[in-house]
Amino acid sequence: MEFEMNRFPVAKLITALGLTMLSAHAQTPSPSADPAANNPDAAKTQFPLAAPAGEDSGAISIAPPAAVNQGPLDPAKWKYGPAYDSQPDSGIWNPVMIKMMKGEKVTGGTVLSTDTPATYCAMANAGYDFIWTEMQHDPRDWDSVGRMWKACPHAKAVPGVRVAYTDEREIQHAMDLGALVIVVPTVRSVEEGKAARDWTMYPPLGKRSLGAGQAFEPEMWGNVPGGYRNTINKNVVLIEMIETVEGVKDAREIAAIPGVAAIFAASGDLGNFSGYKMGTPDYERLINIVHDAAIGAGKRLCGPFLWRDRPDFTCFQNATEVTAIQRGVADELGPLKDTQGKPEVGPYAPRK
């Protein structure tokens, strides 16, 4: 009975001790992943140049003593920093740019209607210098293009594309997916030409945003010498198409835009927009003006493969994957082409 009587005070004591320990534990702050929670000077040590909390730093007018750009902030006078300079030993790693710099002829095979990686890769390994993935006249989406390019990024032909229009979203989709040749259609003015250049090139030459994309992946260009961000401006081939009379008038200024590698005399649309057919004096005059603009600016001159022997033309658009298949079969079969049997009845019988 004595034990039973003393048991309750002991239990009360244990309960009281437990509550005291819990209270003490609750009042002791746990370690935090936030360094500022355990180090009151963390902001000063990690961000020594940061503005004081809750105060106007005056940075719009006064720069830190070690800053290159002193005085009031003026974008027009801003000296671009060296963070993204390409190293002298990084070299040119785009085979198309290498050939164009030498003045050699380059050809682009057109992928018009397929979104199948196997067909794209067959074209990319057929012998062209680049693939002209058609996005102006085909309704495929950019996801399809990305899958095709990623299926064989280091094929013989580098991935290229004709975008639909001079637009930040359109061109940056192409660049972020890994395009090494950008063809811009229907450039009507110097302003449009500069806009196309701006969305293709990173600063300081252009205005391309530094985003993510498969272009940065190791399977694509993530491991190129010097790094993708620092070297793509001197590797991407930008071709601007002259397709209208207005574009022809501004062709010299368009060709002279820094970053434009070539201008393209669009054989079909120059006829479409001028009303004259190839070979007529008015048509040929327009082509010759584009020719003069390219050689005057020291840029390459592009056109259809039909013009591969025309003076000073060195880069060309070839036919589509469908035409390439037809040509390949014709070359392979020779005299056996179109020698199918001719039944007199049934779906294969000649129509009467």
Features from the language model and the residues they span:
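N-terminal amphipathic alpha-helix/helix-capping segment at the start of soluble metabolic enzymes
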Residues: 60-110, 222-234
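Glycine-rich phosphate-binding active-site loops on the catalytic face of alpha/beta enzymes
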Residues: 181-192, 263-273, 314-333
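Conserved, mostly hydrophobic/aromatic
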Residues: 109, 134, 182, 196, ...
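Catalytic cores of alpha/beta
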Residues: 166-180, 184, 191-193, 248-257, ...
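C-terminal helical cap(s) of enzyme catalytic domains, especially alpha/beta-barrels
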Residues: 148, 191-205, 322-346
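Active-site mouth loops of central-metabolism enzymes
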Residues: 102-117, 160-164, 236-249
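Alpha-helix-loop-beta-strand connector modules within alpha/beta enzyme cores
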Residues: 142-168, 172, 200-205, 231-233, ...
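Conserved anion-binding
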Residues: 181-257
